[in-house]
Regions:
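Flexible coil/loop and intrinsically disordered segments
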Residues: 1-268
Length: 268
């Protein structure tokens, strides 16, 4: 262990063949540990015909249906041998989780210059470099909570069920047909991408879908298209160039998202 400079935590987290786990696998192990220690997820639910603790259901989804979602993205890049790490299932999963965390952090930030904030910079580094050492940052700064896990479960359940249907209706109306926005974008991820990602997720979370009815998932696609039209108009303002301006728009999007499933009839 000393020879390879492994920490105690990383040394313990080896699979049966002695292979060091990936950053995401370590993160997932700690995240599931967090869920198991949260009494919110102790109660039993029916899952595929079995009565299981909620935390066991979440752990199962991580390894199966949710991983299948990101595998569909990975398959699109199987020929790119040089960049296989950034297009792996683990990498897509890791980025997705951190983009949720980063958006929450941006909106909740109360300082004056977030670009200089150490936590923000560390989260960006983790997102881009797929870097993970331990769970301390997420726990001590309350970056992950019971609410975060519940929202994560809803989002990933929805994307796992109707991902393609959602992806087909996210583009701004004025863009060329060849342009295709994707929530799984890897390269050149911008603040516009963060704002759109936030808006899509808020539409899902305000749709009335919750953890007890994920087997019957349905979104009103026409209402999604209407919502995305409003969102693209908001974020396309050329004056929105600083992260402070981005945060202001993200805050507005979060405030009006309670009406996102019928935005036209709720605009005053």
């Amino acid at each position: 262990m000393d020879q390879f400079k492994l920490t105690d935590d990383l040394y313990i987290k080896l699979n049966a063949r002695g292979k060091v786990l990936s950053p995401f696998e370590n993160f997932k192990a700690d995240l599931i540990g967090f869920v198991k220690n949260d009494p919110t997820f102790e109660f039993k639910k029916n899952y595929n015909g079995f009565d299981l603790n909620h935390y066991d259901i979440i752990a199962n989804k991580f390894d199966n249906t949710w991983s299948d979602l990101f595998w569909k993205e990975t398959k699109k890049h199987l020929d790119d041998k040089e960049s296989k790490n950034k297009y792996s299932v683990d990498s897509y999963f890791f980025r997705f989780l951190h983009r949720l965390i980063i958006n929450d952090y941006i909106i909740g930030y109360t300082g004056s210059e977030i670009n200089k904030d150490d936590i923000y910079k560390e989260l960006l580094k983790k997102e881009s470099e797929l870097h993970y050492t331990n769970f301390d940052l997420y726990a001590s700064k309350k970056l992950i909570s019971s609410k975060f896990i519940k929202n994560l479960e809803t989002l990933l359940d929805v994307y796992s069920k109707i991902n393609e249907e959602i992806q087909q209706h996210l583009n701004p109306l004025w863009d060329k047909p060849a342009f295709k926005y994707s929530i799984y974008k890897v390269e050149n991820y911008t603040m516009d991408d963060r704002m759109v990602f936030e808006a899509i997720n808020l539409f899902i979370l305000n749709s009335g879908i919750h953890s007890d009815n994920h087997s019957e998932i349905h979104l009103d696609i026409q209402k999604l298209k209407e919502w995305m039209r409003i969102v693209w108009n908001l974020i396309s303002d050329p004056d929105i160039r600083s992260i402070e301006a981005n945060k202001a728009v993200m805050t507005v999007i979060r405030e009006i998202a309670i009406h996102s499933n019928d935005i036209y009839n709720n605009l005053v």
